């Protein structure tokens, strides 16, 4: 029997190999799965810990370079802890990979000694909006803004995407004990095709750890307002 995933402005998807159309009537290639999360709190800088916890349940995730793992959404009153409350975890994946992620529902996850559990996910179609925002994008050796802009421009050219760049806040995260430097990034003036391409392919490295993943600015702002990042 096919298992169903909830929907928002998109056709109901059944994990049974059927053709899925988004709310523009086009074939959906990538989607976002939003899992409700209970438990915590977790460290504010938790991207590597989250990916490690997910990989313990889904070892094949290491090999899926086409999947993105966003940082958890929650509320932070300090610069150290994220309180999840009615938080969510967002995974971006090809439509054909949805079924492989459903075993995460109710799977016990442990992050920094705190137990988390995931509820049944809802499915969200990617939106071809003209502006996109990423909280953190990283490129090798792009330690300052000038080097970052050059690397981001090369990445867009490689994707065949035309856009205006606006670089935001410089951020530092820790991955396997090492400091990684990146910047927030806005893209403007995107065509519908290019907008979807950026969301599907991402930019830069470490997309399993919340980097290089884009959302429409309004949605990204709502996420950030619930989880103030260091």
Curated annotation (Swiss-Prot):
Cited Pfam families: Cas6
Keywords attached to this entry: Antiviral defense, Endonuclease, Hydrolase, Nuclease, RNA-binding
EC top class, as a word: hydrolase
Top-level taxon in the UniProt lineage: Bacteria
EC assignment: 3.1.-.-
Any GO molecular function: endonuclease activity
GO biological processes: defense response to virus
Inducers of expression: Part of an operon going from at least MXAN_7266 to MXAN_7259 that includes a CRISPR operon with transcription continuing into the pre-crRNA locus.
Function: CRISPR (clustered regularly interspaced short palindromic repeat) is an adaptive immune system that provides protection against mobile genetic elements (viruses, transposable elements and conjugative plasmids). CRISPR clusters contain sequences complementary to antecedent mobile elements and target invading nucleic acids. CRISPR clusters are transcribed and processed into CRISPR RNA (crRNA). Processes pre-crRNA into individual crRNA units.
Family statement drawn from the similarity comment of this UniProt entry: Belongs to the CRISPR-associated protein Cas6/Cse3/CasE family. Subtype Myxan subfamily.
Stated name of the protein: CRISPR-associated endonuclease Cas6
Organism: Myxococcus xanthus (strain DK1622)
